[in-house]
C-alpha cells in the first residue's frame, strides 16, 4: 500500500458538487490540515441543480470549521481547455482527482 501525505498540498477535485465529489471534498476538509482544496463543477442540469447547490453550502460550512484549510469553488467545465489552463495556472494543484461525469442518461443518448 502506498501512503501519500496530503498535508500542505493543493488538491483539485473535479465534479465536486456531485455526490462522490462533494463527499471527498468534505472528507479531505475534515481529515487533512493544512490543505487547499479546489473544487470544480459545471453545475449542469442533468439532475436537480438545487441538490448540487445544497452540497456546496454544506462544503462551505465545513470549510469554515477548519481555519487551516482553504476551499475554493470554480463553476466551470473541464471539457473547456481554457478553463483548465486557468485553473492550473492559478492554483498549480499537486494532486488531481477527476470525478467529473456526464450523469444525464437522456443527454448522453441525444448527444453521444
Task: Give the location of each predicted region.
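N-terminal Rossmann-like NAD(P)+-binding domain of SDR-like oxidoreductases, especially those catalyzing
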Residues: 1-112
Amino acid at each position: 500500500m502506498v501512503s501519500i501525505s496530503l498535508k500542505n498540498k493543493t488538491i483539485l477535485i473535479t465534479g465536486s458538487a456531485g455526490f462522490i465529489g462533494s463527499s471527498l471534498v468534505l472528507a479531505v476538509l475534515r481529515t487533512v490540515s493544512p490543505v487547499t482544496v479546489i473544487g470544480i463543477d459545471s453545475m449542469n442540469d442533468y439532475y436537480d441543480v438545487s441538490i448540487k447547490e445544497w452540497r456546496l453550502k454544506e462544503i462551505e460550512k465545513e470549510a469554515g470549521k477548519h481555519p487551516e484549510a482553504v476551499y475554493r469553488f470554480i463553476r466551470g467545465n473541464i471539457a473547456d481547455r481554457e478553463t483548465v489552463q486557468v485553473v492550473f495556472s492559478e492554483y498549480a494543484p499537486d494532486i488531481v482527482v477527476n470525478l467529473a461525469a456526464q450523469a444525464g442518461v437522456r443527454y448522453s443518448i441525444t448527444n453521444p
